[in-house]
């Protein structure tokens, strides 16, 4: 079978080594004669899996001891609802930084529970998209927290600054598409959350990292499954968790440590992104419409100067083993998502195909 590279924005490709190991263990996990999918989440064997996954994640991100790590259901959209219900307390507003589609979705969901102060930081100059730096964010004095998304997958925009708004600001960040791609100073945040299906593991599990002092503030009518305090007390097993996704996520954490940790992964990711952006910028057929300082390392959207070639480009790319390059319906064009599991060789194969396609169609 020819090599296939999956550029999907999510669910995204998983490390080949992880998939091979999962295949080997699928029907007889640890000599039990059964799959890890079939054992009780309360068995000593699975509790060990869960504990090791948390330990490895803590090691990778250097998570301080005063933070709890949860493995939840519901994806990032579930957290859009959980956050205000857990953290508003007696306040009626929160700052929502809107930099793209997903942060706007979070703000819209928050409207069910409060009157969010929406701060739109998007800018467009001559067709080039950028986002305002943090020192230009007009934060309110009475907000329960500040919510933002460091990486917008659809627009391909990124915020590389880490927050420094003072100790009185509780910062919440949706790291779904960029977690584990580079080191993070977790201590700058009150809550970090991330859907698994991009850089953590398969769809079905969501990581929530929450500072201990933020627990115990949930609204009295919050569904128990969304209550962080309930989940902490239950070790993320208030109900049956997505055990296979948890197991595979733990294997990805182990793989990341084996690669040299997040410093090494960050170097690889930068090299992949630089290769692809250089190919786009040096071409006459492809264009990326994001300002240099805000270009995402994880998600690279690009358009063909002649949109009539979009279908042909995507069809031929697929035939060459370059899959899932179609841009989001909101943005159109093409998009290459180059998360941790995407190899440099995969990006090189895409760049070589793009050059060949331009020679034949430019």
From Swiss-Prot:
The keyword Cytoplasm applies. It is found in: Cytoplasm. GO terms for biological process: L-serine biosynthetic process; pyridoxine biosynthetic process. SUPFAM superfamilies: PLP-dependent transferases. Keywords: Amino-acid biosynthesis, Aminotransferase, Cytoplasm, Pyridoxal phosphate, Pyridoxine biosynthesis, Serine biosynthesis, Transferase. GO terms for cellular component: cytoplasm. Binds 1 pyridoxal phosphate per subunit. Signal peptide: none annotated. L-glutamate binds at residue 42. One of its GO terms (molecular function) is O-phospho-L-serine:2-oxoglutarate aminotransferase activity. Transmembrane segments: none annotated. It is an enzyme of class 2 (transferase). PANTHER family: PHOSPHOSERINE AMINOTRANSFERASE (PTHR43247:SF1). Homodimer. This is Phosphoserine aminotransferase. It comes from Xenorhabdus nematophila (strain ATCC 19061 / DSM 3370 / CCUG 14189 / LMG 1036 / NCIMB 9965 / AN6). The gene is serC.
């Amino acid at each position: 079978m020819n090599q296939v590279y999956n550029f999907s924005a999510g669910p995204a490709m998983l490390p080949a080594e992880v998939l091979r190991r999962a295949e080997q263990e699928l029907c007889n996990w640890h000599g039990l004669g059964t799959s890890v999918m079939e054992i009780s989440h309360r068995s000593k064997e699975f509790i060990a899996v869960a504990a090791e996954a948390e330990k490895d994640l803590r090691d990778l991100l250097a998570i301080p001891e005063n933070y709890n790590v949860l493995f939840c259901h519901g994806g990032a959209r579930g957290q859009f609802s959980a956050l205000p219900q857990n953290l508003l307390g007696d306040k009626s507003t929160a700052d929502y930084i809107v930099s793209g589609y997903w942060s706007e979705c979070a703000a819209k969901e928050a409207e069910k529970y409060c009157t969010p102060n929406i701060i739109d930081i998007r800018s467009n100059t001559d067709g080039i998209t950028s986002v305002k730096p943090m020192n230009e964010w007009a934060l309110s004095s009475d907000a329960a927290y500040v919510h933002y998304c460091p990486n917008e997958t659809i627009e391909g925009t990124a915020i590389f600054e880490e927050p420094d708004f003072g100790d009185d600001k509780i910062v919440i960040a949706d790291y779904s598409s960029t977690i584990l791609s580079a080191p993070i100073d977790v201590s700058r945040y009150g809550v970090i959350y991330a859907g698994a299906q991009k850089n953590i593991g398969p769809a079905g599990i969501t990581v929530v990292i929450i500072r201990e002092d933020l627990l115990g503030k949930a609204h009295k009518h919050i569904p128990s499954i969304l209550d962080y305090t309930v989940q902490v007390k239950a070790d993320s097993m208030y109900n049956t968790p997505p055990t296979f996704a948890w197991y595979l996520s733990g294997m990805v954490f182990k793989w990341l440590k084996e690669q040299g940790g997040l410093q090494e992964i960050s170097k690889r990711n930068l090299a992949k992104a630089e290769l692809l952006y250089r190919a786009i910028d040096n071409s006459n057929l492809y264009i990326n419409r994001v300002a240099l300082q805000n270009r995402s390392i994880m998600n690279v959207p690009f358009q063909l100067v002649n949109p009539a070639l979009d279908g042909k480009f995507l069809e031929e790319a697929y035939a060459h083993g370059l899959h899932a390059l179609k841009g989001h319906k909101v943005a159109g064009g093409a998009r290459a998502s180059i998360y941790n599991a995407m190899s440099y060789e995969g990006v090189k194969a895409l760049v070589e195909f793009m050059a060949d396609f331009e020679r034949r169609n430019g």
